[in-house]
Amino acid sequence: MQNNQTVQKTQWSQFGTLIIVFFFWGFVAASNDILIPFFKENLHLSQAYSQLVSFAFYTAYTVGSIIFMIISETRKRDLLQDMGYKNGISVGLIISALGTLLFFPAAQTSSFFLFISGLFIVGLGFALQQIAANPLAVILGDPKTG
């Protein structure tokens, strides 16, 4: 009996890059907790307000996912099918980078609102990156083990 199925080899160079990106998402997400005592002390915030750091960042994941779903439903087609997974990750990285740019005026003006807005935008970018990266990770490997 002959096996006519072809085996897809894992594309390790692309997969390695994706692993590094996943590491940095985790690193940034874990680093948000470091900002809480810093903001609390330097911006004279209550404990409740300082916890908005985590709230804004993780709420952005939910909001970003809902926005992505609404766009895909409105178009009657998955946005990533047209954009591509790699481009989706790239656009997400650009959105996240734009969010980090808000930290400059936020630091100059000691504006907690700008800091939180920047973190929210970073979270929106991360949402798009992860929506694109998870199926890409499966596609890069053997579908049998995906």
Regions found by a protein language model. Give the residues of each.
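Intracellular juxtamembrane helix-capping segments at the cytosolic ends
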Residues: L128-D142
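Extracytoplasmic
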Residues: S13-L45, S65-F68
